């Protein structure tokens, strides 16, 4: 992930001139919450609002057309966040649903456990689920990168690692390995 070297991060929205909303769209409630949050920001702030996450694929284009957000970018574009947030013109860049994240996270500020994404997407096509359409097919993160991330985090004092993904049980099916081998 980007180092955010061009931005100063704050948790106080009143101080922010840029707000990035990492949205979820798994449930109707999550979508509603995102739209409600954007409305709250519109009332109380003049900050530029950017939408990323799963909602970029389901609601992003409409929110951009309504001028409720300045920019929309998908999961695969988060690695370019510095350049995206610096754009003056509104944009819609949903990204690539086949992208495999190559970023390595060195730290989790304020956390005692480290979360390691090992897998993304899902090959199941459950009739009630939107995940394959907003996250793409199942794909595994590179084993070397996963182990590198764990090593870096261990050097930063973490001793507990939680392996995460959309469907962790499918880890390795696309790369001819398995969770047990990892």
Predicted regions mapped to residue ranges:
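Alpha-helix-loop-beta-strand connector modules within alpha/beta enzyme cores
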Residues: 176-182
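Proteins enriched for Cys/Gly/acidic motifs involved in redox and nucleic-acid/cofactor modification
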Residues: 1-170
